[in-house]
Amino acid sequence: MSIFFLAFVSSLFANPLQDALNKAKPDAVIKLHNGIYYGNLVIDKPVTLVGIGEDVEIRGDGNASVITIHSSRVCLKNLLISNSGKNMQKIDAAVALKQVKHCEISNCRVQNVLYGIDMDRVERSSILHNDITVAKNDIALRGNGLKLYYSHYNTIRGNSIHHTRDVTLNYSHHNLLQDNTFTHNRFATHLELSNANVLQHNRYMYNSVGMMFMGVKETKVLANKIYSSTGAAGIGVMIGDVSDFVFTGNSVRYNAKGIYIQGAEKARGMKRFFRNNEIAYNAEALHFHASIRDNTIVHNKFFGNIDDVLKDIGGDFDASNVVEYNYWDRYDGFDANGDGIGDTPYRVYQHADLLWQENHKVKFFYAAPVMSLLDFLLKLAPFIEPDLIMEDKKPIFRSF
């Protein structure tokens, strides 16, 4: 292994850093002193590029990606990477990794770029302790902070990803996202057709949607904090067409919709498991779109929510659900034998809510006194049959 140092040299006609990379032997370590180095680098051999000062910047010329990696076993450490191109189709990024393995990007800062880190068919690589943001545009015109495509067995840990558009995983399996912070993004983590991923101990705040899962299998979401999604329709967790989905030990607070679950009426066997979560202070704790089936909801705490359960179109609560041993602060039953379990089930019905199931414009009057009165009258003397949308057969009588 060779180690050599490179100091910043200003030149209009040469790129000393690219020259150093071209001349470096495999597994060389290139150490950079403070300064601004030209970007648009192409790395095609295993090397380590490390900043040994606090102000080592690799700056692109505003065209293409700042660093493109075509070799496995490349490490980037302690760098500021900035000023990519702006071509959305070409996915201009701070760092673009292309069909590589065993790479590492750690303790880097990414700013003023279109995309942050683009991982295209990358395996067994690590993105660790980076601060990633993108150029300040309208959120729909920003690029993703992190993009994984056909990328497997990677570790994304300890990063702060903020003020980007999305973080996406497409066709990407067996990845670990752990101890990251996601703030001020659109879809903070969006997994689509990606299986056996683990999201653990991450923190989400001020995103439009915290987590989104579409067409995923065998995914585990463990001990995350999903808080304060923004906007009137801000969603903490959005779940659609998932199977063997485990959601355990999470805290979901201060969202318009805590957990939004889309279940197709004809879909069966899409198992979802919600255990030991705290779902609190949301406008809607659980929002179901269409049918309510194949859910196991046990040992959770629901408190401080405006509505515990809502359903926005037709669909039944059927016997495939297992709902028990949850704490609901609205439960008004008794515990005669003192075993901590309510003597009667906790049932949630739709009364006046049925009106906006047929006409969503009616929800404009959601908190109006006339709707509250109508809801009270329907409970007192129902003249239309209410829908049972949730039944906890063994509700916890007091918080546990």
Where do the model's predicted regions map?
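Acidic Gly/Asp/Thr-rich repetitive segments characteristic of extracellular carbohydrate-active
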Residues: 11-42
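Functionally critical loop-and-helix segments that line ligand-binding/catalytic clefts
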Residues: 230-232, 236, 245, 258-265, ...
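Extracellular beta-strand/beta-solenoid scaffold signature
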Residues: 60-68, 88-97, 112-119, 139-149, ...
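Surface-exposed loop/turn motifs in large extracellular/passenger domains
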Residues: 66-78, 95-106, 123-128, 136, ...
